[in-house]
Regions:
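A beta-strand edge to alpha-helix "cap/lid" segment located at domain peripheries
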Residues: 1-28, 38-121
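Short glycine-dipeptide loop
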Residues: 35
Length: 121
């Protein structure tokens, strides 16, 4: 795996995600996740583990979507765990991630809720 820039602050992960996604780098996006991370995607489902997350992003990024930077909401930090979130540009809810500080001081996603879907009625 190539040497990627590390997120040295929890908020760095969102910027790195946008940069890597916009060049189609699924492995680079997956490198932002812990080995056993859980992503709440596709809607209503879960993708578990860095390799499965990489495979998912490979499919998504094959369509060459364009991601725009989103202004982060205030980060909540408790020790080595942080909650980061961003409001989508269209104002429809929020995205949230739980990230954990690694032994080298960098941060990786542990839990990722990329979009909130209202429950079915």
């Amino acid at each position: 795996m190539p040497e990627y820039e590390k997120a040295m602050r929890p908020e760095d992960i969102t910027r790195l995600f946008v940069e890597r996604s916009n060049v189609g780098d699924a492995a680079g996006v997956a490198a932002l996740y812990e080995q056993d991370a859980v992503m709440a995607y596709p809607p209503g489902g879960q993708t578990v583990g860095r390799e499965a997350i990489r495979a998912l992003w490979e499919k998504v990024l094959a369509n060459r979507p364009r991601f725009e930077p989103e202004q982060p909401l205030p980060t909540l930090v408790s020790g080595d765990i942080a909650l980061t979130s961003t409001p989508p540009r269209d104002g429809s809810g929020a995205r949230a991630q739980v990230v954990r500080r690694q032994p080298d001081g960098s941060w990786l996603r542990l839990l990722d809720q990329p979009e909130f879907v209202p429950p079915a009625r």
